[in-house]
A protein has these predicted regions:
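A generic "binding-loop/recognition-motif" signal
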Residues: 39, 48, 83, 115-116, ...
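Active-site loop signature of alpha/beta-hydrolase-fold enzymes
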Residues: 39-40, 87, 118, 180-181
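Rossmann-like dinucleotide/flavin-binding elements
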Residues: 2-5, 10-36, 129, 135-184
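FAD-binding core/adjacent interface of flavoenzyme oxidoreductases
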Residues: 1-11, 32, 77-147
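N-terminal Rossmann-like dinucleotide/flavin-binding domain of flavoprotein oxidoreductases
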Residues: 44-103, 184-196
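N-terminal glycine-rich anion-binding loops that anchor highly charged ligand groups
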Residues: 33-45
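Short, glycine/charged-enriched secondary-structure capping and boundary segments
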Residues: 24-25, 46-49, 123-127, 164-167, ...
Length: 196
């Protein structure tokens, strides 16, 4: 099978991937961007983004990622669905295999694969994923309506999830390792003043 040759290959479609695509396209590098398993990245599961410049009233993660996607397309980014499954980065041109079948040779590769939810590593945790264990309040929050729930973590993501769930659940416990929260002050205040 002959490899497709491209100037610039971007792997990942979160904010970093789309931003790289916008700049690469404006520089006439004809970027090809593979969106991965979750087009738009982890931000698509976030309800309110309030700390990104340019959105004074805040914006949903889905809307923000749609905006970035459209902007990347507007400048000529070739957006494709697929997952990088192998890489040979030993010399240029770099070779990336997509979905274990298509090989792409790229002069430049930008890897923007982003983040994924962290699990605790408890026994049977993955077994109960989607059946009481969740890593996405906006995805699964409806199932916990009027129930007692617990969120593990003390950072912004955990506090945002707890705040969202407080609108659905009867009670929300925030479980943290340390005697303090690591979240931004505004998120701490929001969580602490909610009676749930």
């Amino acid at each position: 099978m002959e490899a497709e040759k491209v100037k610039c290959l971007i792997i990942g479609s979160g904010p970093a991937g789309y931003t790289a695509a916008i700049y690469a396209a404006r520089a006439n590098l004809s970027p090809v961007l593979y969106e991965g398993l979750q087009p738009g990245g982890q931000l698509t599961t976030t309800t309110d983004i309030e700390n990104f410049p340019g959105y004074p009233e805040g914006i949903s993660g889905t809307q923000m990622m749609d905006d970035l996607r459209r902007q990347a397309e507007r400048f000529g980014t070739d957006l494709r669905y697929g997952v990088a499954t192998a890489a040979d980065l030993s010399r240029s041109p770099y070779k990336i295999t997509i979905d274990e079948e298509k090989v792409i040779e790229a002069q430049t590769i930008i890897i923007a694969t982003g983040a994924a939810a962290k699990y605790l590593g408890l026994e049977d945790e993955k077994k109960y994923a989607g059946m009481g264990v969740s890593a996405c309040a906006t995805c699964d929050g409806f199932f916990y309506r009027k129930k007692v729930v617990a969120v593990v973590g003390g950072g912004d993501t955990a506090c945002e999830e707890a705040s969202y769930l407080a609108g659905l659940a009867s009670k929300v416990y925030l479980i943290v390792r340390k005697p303090f929260l690591r979240a931004s002050k505004i998120m701490q205040e929001r969580v602490m003043k909610d009676e749930k």
